Amino acid sequence: ARLKELEARTGRRVYTVLQLRVHPSLLALKERLGQEKGAKDVVLTYVTGRGKWYGKSWKVDEAKSGGLATNIGIHFFDLLAWLFGRALHVEVHARTPTVNAGYLELEGARVRWFLSIDPSFVPEPLRRQGKRTYRSIAVDGEEVEFSEGFTDLHTEVYRKTLAGEGFGLDEAAEAIRVAALLRTLPLSQPSPENRHPFLG
C-alpha cells in the first residue's frame, strides 16, 4: 500500500522484476494455454541447489527474507498467477528450511507444487551431469522444463521497463499474497490427488 501511495504522490511508477514472464519457453506455454479451455492439472517443481553458505546467510531469517516461499519461490508463484489466475484455495504440505510444498487451486488450474534448495532433489540423470537446478512445469502431463535460458532474463525485463512495458505493482500483488499465506498457514495432510510426487 505504501508503494502505491508513493506512486500516487510522485506521479512515478514502481516496476518489478518478474523475469519468468519473459522466458521463451514459458511465453510459448502462455500462448498455448490461451488457446485451450478448461482447468489444467499442473505439477510444478522448482529445485535450485544452494551450498552450506545459504544456511548461514540472512536468507534463512524469515523476518529478513520472507522465508523460502518468498526468497526462492516468489517468481514461481508469479508464474502460476500469470498463467492460471488467482489462488482460490491454498494448502501447505511441507515447510522446512530446505523444502516447501503444497497445493494451490487457481482460477484455471489445480497445482501440486514443490520448492527446494536441496540439490539431492534434482533428478539423478541431471545430477550426473553436474546440474544443481531443476525447474519443471507439467500441464496435463506435458512437461516444459525451463532450467536453462535464465542468462539474459533480467536484461530483457530492464529493456521492457525502459521501453514503457514494465511489470507494475499490481502484477506482482498476487504472488506476494500467496507467498505471505504460505508462511502463516498451518500444515495440512495432503490427499493422494493433491500430493506432489516428490513428497513420496
Feature names for model-found ranges:
Residues 1-18:
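Beta-strand-loop-alpha-helix segment that lines the small-molecule cofactor/substrate pocket
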Residues 2, 24, 28-31, 79, ...:
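Alpha-helical elements of Rossmann-like donor-binding domains used by nucleotide-donor carbohydrate transfer enzymes
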Residues 9, 159-200:
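C-terminal helix-rich "cap/oligomerization" subdomain common to oxidoreductases
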Residues 12, 20-86:
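Predominantly a Rossmann-like dinucleotide-binding segment in NAD(P)-dependent oxidoreductases
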Residues 41-43, 90, 111-116:
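Beta-strand scaffold of nucleotide-dependent catalytic cores
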Residues 45, 87-96:
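Conserved S-adenosyl-L-methionine
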Residues 98-153:
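C-terminal substrate-binding/catalytic lobe of Rossmann-fold NAD(P)-dependent oxidoreductases
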Residues 153-159:
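Conserved C-terminal active-site "lid" loop/helix of NAD(P)H-dependent oxidoreductases
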